[in-house]
């Protein structure tokens, strides 16, 4: 189980990403579309002044059950370990053990 502080940090990042998503996309689009060097530089400065944690790259998907940050399946929001446990119990329909 992940520490509560890590889970809270990730939820805070998720909120910041959503809050600044539109503003960040507008600035990036302005940088790409503009030919004026001064406008590009001003837009880059505004983009740099946004909170660091509002960058979507810093957001990490975590397992909803245990909080593990690696090997999380987006479809289920579960890590590989919890997904396997849920499949074995039968809580996720359609899953079965593979054999070859």
Swiss-Prot record:
Gene3D superfamilies referenced in this protein's UniProt entry, alphabetically: 1.10.287.1480
Keyword set, alphabetical order: Metal-binding, Ribonucleoprotein, Ribosomal protein, RNA-binding, rRNA-binding, Zinc
GO biological process, one term: translation
Residues given in the record as Zn(2+) binding sites: 63, 66, 79, 82
An example Gene Ontology CC term for this record: small ribosomal subunit
Keyword tRNA processing: no
Cofactor note text: Binds 1 zinc ion per subunit.
Needed cofactors: Zn(2+)
GO molecular function list: metal ion binding; rRNA binding; structural constituent of ribosome
Residue stretches in coiled coil: none
Quaternary structure and interacting proteins, as annotated: Part of the 30S ribosomal subunit. Contacts proteins S3 and S10.
Similarity-based family: Belongs to the universal ribosomal protein uS14 family.
Task of the protein: Binds 16S rRNA, required for the assembly of 30S particles and may also be responsible for determining the conformation of the 16S rRNA at the A site.
PANTHER family hit by this protein: 30S RIBOSOMAL PROTEIN S14, SMALL RIBOSOMAL SUBUNIT PROTEIN US14M
Designated name of the protein: Small ribosomal subunit protein uS14
Organism listed in the record: Legionella pneumophila (strain Lens)
Gene field: rpsN
């Amino acid at each position: 189980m992940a520490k509560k502080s890590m889970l809270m940090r990730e939820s805070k990042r998720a909120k910041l990403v959503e809050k600044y998503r539109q503003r960040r996309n507008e600035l990036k689009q302005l940088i790409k579309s503009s030919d004026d060097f001064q406008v590009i530089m001003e837009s880059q400065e505004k983009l740099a002044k946004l909170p660091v944690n509002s960058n979507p790259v810093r957001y990490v998907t975590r397992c909803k059950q245990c909080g593990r940050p690696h090997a999380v399946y987006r479809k289920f929001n579960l890590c590989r370990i919890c997904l396997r446990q849920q499949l074995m119990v039968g809580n996720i329909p359609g899953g079965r053990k593979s054999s070859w």
